[in-house]
UniProtKB/Swiss-Prot annotation:
Species in which this protein is naturally found: Thermococcus fumicolans
Name of the protein in question: DNA polymerase sliding clamp
Gene3D superfamilies listed in its UniProt record: 3.70.10.10
Signal peptide start-end: none
SUPFAM superfamilies listed in its UniProt record: DNA clamp
Domain of life: Archaea
Length: 249
């Protein structure tokens, strides 16, 4: 059998895949003896998604040989949603062209997901000269995106010394969410210079859907530069988004 991988906590894994599936229809997952990885671009080429899950976050990780599998993300998401919070998730692939997905909880339920051919693109995650780094609670970011969506289709991020704010302006109203290090929601901020950039709210909304309220989210950005958003899965796994800026006239 090429691989058998076990993850304790089916819902956590499902939330992770659901977040990525909001932005991409299909993906090529690389399964190696070091872990699972995936890098893809959304169809509009506005967001790059990078996922790295090292073997250490799984309770069982057996891989006979390196393999890349193509998956329909919507189908994968719908199956994973059938897992309960405390279910054990088992992913297996044999010699046939399907992924076996098993939930073990009060019963043992097994799905077979056909694998698909996915074009593997050479995508680099660039190291950019960001001038601001902000660490905040997932709940704060999720609520800010919801607030901003009532006003506009774009949200501006502004970082200055010891202060981070998110603003949206419409034709008749506006909203501002401001945080300092005295607020529980802002965990850390590093600013080389006052930094401002705007981003599309529809993309931000998709990016934050799978983030838990207590999760720590790291945001890096520069003046009219892409935004990099990272959040960690069990300390060692990481999901990264790189979002192109909304350039203002």
């Amino acid at each position: 059998m090429p691989f058998e991988i076990v993850f304790d906590g089916a819902k956590e894994f499902a939330d992770l895949i659901a977040t990525a599936s909001n932005l991409i229809d299909e993906a090529a997952f690389k399964v190696t003896d070091e872990g699972i990885s995936m890098r893809a671009m959304d169809p509009s080429r506005v967001v790059l998604i990078d996922l790295n899950l090292p073997e250490s976050i799984f309770s069982k990780y057996e891989v006979e040989e390196e393999e890349t599998i193509g998956i329909n993300m919507d189908h994968f998401k719908k199956i994973l949603k059938r897992g309960k919070g405390k279910d054990t998730l088992i992913l297996k692939k044999g010699d046939e062209n399907f992924l076996e997905i098993t939930f073990e909880g009060t019963a043992k339920r097994t799905f077979r997901l056909p694998l698909i051919d996915v074009e593997e693109l050479e995508l680099d995650l660039p190291e950019l000269p960001f001038t601001a780094k902000v660490v905040l609670l997932g709940e704060v970011l999720k609520e800010a995106v919801k607030d901003a969506s009532l006003v506009s289709d774009a949200m501006k991020f502004i970082a200055k010394e010891n202060e981070f704010s998110m603003r949206a302006e419409g034709e008749t109203n506006e909203v501002e969410i401001k945080l300092t290090l005295e607020d529980e929601g802002l965990l850390d901020i590093e600013v080389e210079e006052e930094t401002k950039s705007a981003y599309g709210i529809s993309y931000l909304a998709d990016m934050v859907k799978g983030i838990g309220k207590a999760d720590e989210v790291t945001i890096r950005f520069g003046n009219e530069m892409p935004l990099q958003m990272d959040y960690f899965i069990r300390d060692e796994g990481k999901l990264t988004f790189l979002l192109a800026p909304r350039v203002e006239d």
